[in-house]
């Protein structure tokens, strides 16, 4: 949004990508996780870091280790009471849109509300996110330069998503790329190639590709030396062939 909004605004909003204010694990959040998974955290995980490794507007992510398998995982947890807050936000948007439209005849943004409603429904259902991630993962099995963390179905619900833990750094962290011997231009080329394939080949597109949702790993077996990691699969769009062929 740097080309649309003032820098002072975008600098403030960028923290919502993965460094938003988090919710303490004790109390309502821990209770919600246990209710969703059907057991105390101590029975499911041998380790569960109470400090989130990332926090955004809808959820926060904790690093943990599954007790039975020893697998290190990332547990994405939806904030408690978020669904009711979203209902209130949508109502406020409807009132504001109607009021502005009443006073300004040229204001024609009523289409935004249904769009936000559809997006909210998708992003508040982590099982839908799981289905999206599994679909996009299957689409890119032929490529070694892109990775989608796999989801542990038995530990995932509408409000809790448990997935393979993947390390890496943000795609806008040029210093980290240079430090690891990666070429930023080659990383950018991979991103363009991956999203171009989503749009023109599969017609199934990740619609929230901000730097908090795209990571880079070093990967010795690729000639480029890197691998793109796609995160947060809550919001996708299917593109009709007629739309894709227009481009």
Language model: regions and residue ranges:
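Broad phosphate/nucleotide-binding scaffolds in NTP-utilizing and phosphate-metabolizing enzymes
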Residues: 1-196, 216-241, 245
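Conserved catalytic-loop position in the HRD/HxD motif
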Residues: 203, 208-210
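Glycine-rich phosphate/oxyanion-binding loops and their immediately adjacent helices
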Residues: 199
